[in-house]
Regions:
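Compositionally biased terminal segments of proteins
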Residues: 1-123
């Protein structure tokens, strides 16, 4: 989701971060905390509960290399979008991306000027 997905789907623009939408599930939360610690982002506030509440944004780093982990995005349900995801290779790395219809729907529901501009260019 976010600027990288927008670019993948054909509207090339700058972005200051990588937005990753994560499922709100206990096993997923445990794996995320472990992975983040392995990457060296361990802070006292890091715990599984951060990933078990919808509407959370966990930010790591500073633009332009910031990573944002989102537990919810506007107008979309994770399981439904995950079922319609696109599997792609980016720099020889397999990634799952939100489908174009789901991305446009999300952008319209988010409603910020930047999101509406993305939706207009992607439609």
């Amino acid at each position: 989701v976010g600027g990288y997905a927008v670019c993948y789907h054909g509207y090339f623009r700058t972005t200051g971060d990588l937005d990753l939408w994560v499922a709100v599930e206990p096993d997923n939360a445990r794996k995320l905390v472990q992975l983040i610690r392995e990457f060296g982002f361990d802070v006292p506030e890091l715990n599984e509960s951060l990933f078990l509440q919808k509407g959370r944004i966990i930010r790591m780093g500073e633009p332009p290399t910031r990573i944002e982990l989102l537990t919810e995005i506007s107008g979309c349900e994770f399981a439904e979008c995950h079922a319609r995801r696109i599997e792609a290779m980016l720099d020889d790395i397999p990634v799952s991306l939100i489908s174009l219809p789901d991305l446009v729907h999300n952008k319209l529901k988010a409603g910020r000027l930047k999101d509406l501009d993305d939706a207009r260019h992607l439609s």
